[in-house]
Amino acid sequence: LVSSPFLNYLPAIKIMPHNRAEILATLREPYFNRTKAKYSSHQNTPYELQISQYPSIYKYDNVVVSAHPIDRMYLDYGAQIHRELFQNLLNKLLKNPMVKVKLPSSGRVNLLHFSKDNRYVIHLLYATPIQRGVAQVIDDLVPIYNTQVEIMVEEDVKKVYLIPENLELEFIKSNNKISLTVPEFTCHTAIVLEY
């Protein structure tokens, strides 16, 4: 999931998984919890050398369980390793996602299906908000180049184009997978796949 041990800023719950569960990450507990009675001059207490009997993360069937609140730690501390860990766990569950897009982390993807119109529409958004006082604002819109997109659809796609530019895109069909590249967009574009 990640290549080396790392610090989790919040405590873990002690969970004992089913014996058929796959252990994805082990846990090393701190020597002690920092309190007024037990103080360490470092921000974090060093961890014990032996691995805990309680795992940090495990997978059982189609469920992944984490002993640490990964989402809250990322929200509170913004550590990239927590975001990567979450993404890797999600990838373990989503073996064949319907849409894959290579965008920077601030990118957003939205897929719509208009069955009456025989088309799919993929919206791509990218902007980097920055903190200005209490508000997050978008000062600069940066163009994004050569965005790779894959979508799994059962329908026989005939035409792919960007709107509102009405720029037709080349695409590759392989079984149910459509692969294409959006040459450039700034802030937003929409890809239409007609079948």
Language model regions located:
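A conserved amphipathic helix/loop scaffold
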Residues: 1-195
